[in-house]
Structure formats: C-alpha cells, structure tokens
Amino acid sequence: MPSYSINVGNVELVSVSDGFPTRSPLMPFPDTTIEQWREFPELMKENDQIGSRYGTTAVRSGGKLIIVDTGLQAADGILMEDMKAKGVHPEEVDLVVFTHLHPDHVGWNLTAGKPTFPKARYLIPQRDWDYWTKPEVVKDAEHIRNQVLPLKDHGVIEFMGDDYQITDELTAVSTPGHTPGHVSILIDSQGERAYILGDVAHSPAQAHYTDWCPIFDVE
C-alpha cells in the first residue's frame, strides 16, 4: 500500500497535498517561545521554522468517493495535480465534506466560477454556515463570498446537523472551538475506528502543551 494511503476496515483514506509551506511557529502560537518549540526537534526545520500542510483527504466508503475539505488554492497550489497522481479524479467525486469553512479548507470549491467537483454534493456543517454567513462576519470574509456562497447559487449544498451520517461508515461529529460549527469525521468500519480531525489541533506539540491555542481558533 502506498505511504499516502491507509485502510480503516473497508474504508480507504488517501492523503492529498495542496502544498507544504513553512513558517515560524510563533505566528500561529504567539504566546509560545522558540525554546519551547526546540523541545520538539522532529517538528523543527531550518531557521526555527515548522512545516504546515494544506490539502484534503480522499475517502472511499460505501461505493462513494468523498473529499474532506478542498485545500487553499494558492498560486502554487498543487491539489489537482496531486489528486490525479494518486488516482483521485475530480469528475468522479460524489461528496465534498467540510470540517469547517476557513480559507485553507474551501479553496478549490470552484474553478473559473464552476464547482471543481461537478457531480458532487457539498456538505457543510449547519452551525459553521450560520456563523460565516452572519452579515458582520461575511463582510470581512472574502473566501466565503468567493468560494462558498456561489455553491448555493449552483444548488449543490447540503447542510449537516449534529452527528450527521455521511455513509454507514462515516459520521460528522461536532468538535467546536476552532470554529463554532467545526466537525471531525469519525470512520467506523469492521471494528476499526479513526478520525479525520480537521483543525482540532494544529501541531503534535499541543498533545504535550494542552493549553496552547493557535490564533486561528474562534472560541
């Protein structure tokens, strides 16, 4: 099995990249110190930088091809290229499921004004939609206006409530905090379980320093 793919019971998960930028860990975690980060040499790169990852997880479950989040679509974004290299083709995607609606999770929703995944339904957590579409929030959220609201005009959105059953093996469970409507995806198949966490945590270092919260957390 390729290193970018794992199975959880009958469910196949394929990790797809949209890029691996580096940055100072003090940018997302301004209340920490470089000395604290140096306690985790396996996380550190040159010049006291840490790696980041944009991308998606492709999931095959119950005869469906599902994409969890759609990356950032920066100028140097590679999501489409990496998907095709790993045998994941946009025109075959049945469902696009969002853990939340931050810019680096909705970037490839549309291409040239049309849904990037043409036959897919786009599943959005209802609570996150309610938050991001508030007038006082959406006016400052260009990514919502450009990459999320047009999906409604295309008629491809479905909303997920609490414990939303995506397939018999996948459930969207509420994990608020990073955003008010954030969800994680529980995979439960053939006695095996795993989670696609979304942005519940941003670094393995948070398992040690459990009080570290990145500036991106809304709550």
Question: Predicted regions span which residues?
Answer:
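Conserved beta-strand hairpin/beta-sheet module of binuclear metal-dependent hydrolase folds
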Residues: 2-85, 184-198, 203
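Residues that act as N-cap/strand-start positions at coil-to-secondary-structure junctions
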Residues: 51-53, 160, 179-181
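Metallo-beta-lactamase
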Residues: 88, 92, 116-174, ...
